[in-house]
Amino acid sequence: MNRLVIIGASGHGKVIADIAIKNGYDNIVFLDDDKHIKMCAGFPVIGGTCEAEKIAGDKIVAIGNAEIREKIQSGIETVTLIHPNAVISRRVRIGKGSVVMAGTVINSDVTIGDGCIINTGASVDHDCKIGQYTHISVGAHVAGTCEIGSNV
């Protein structure tokens, strides 16, 4: 059984759950600090974010706020998830805990930091550097040789 613990039971978490299924995860659970949330995308919410270290399985933080994402991710090991419909050059480096959504194009010699979100339909062209915990929004296009800092 391939288990993924998604930290953050909201819209972003729902999209990550879909990507996880496409990547072969067959046991998905969520953690969230809102005790009123019991299910997300048809999967159970089994506890709060502080329990992440104790729960077995691969982990990913699905929280849009960069500061919160960094704080949670700094205390745990996380996986990187890439939607199978993303087009990524063989010469791309993607950091731990980052998520690449459907329809994304990432071209040659791009470096993406830890905990980043490269959202649906975005493109990052050649020789770019994307800092840690940065969000490239839905449909955004980053021209070649750009550098974007951390927590943007």
Task: Say what each PLM segment does.
Residues 17, 36-89:
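Phosphate-bearing ligand-interacting subdomains
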Residues 80-152:
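Structural signal for interior beta-strand "rungs" in well-ordered beta-sheet cores
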Residues 1-49, 53:
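Hydrophobic, well-ordered beta-alpha structural blocks that scaffold small-molecule cofactor pockets
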Residues 11-12, 66-68, 124:
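Short alpha-helical
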Residues 1-2, 27, 56, 95, ...:
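A general structural motif
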Residues 7-10, 63, 143:
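Short glycine-rich loop/turn motifs that provide flexible caps or phosphate-binding loops at active sites
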Residues 8, 59, 78, 125-126:
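Generic structural signal for conserved hydrophobic packing positions in ordered secondary structure
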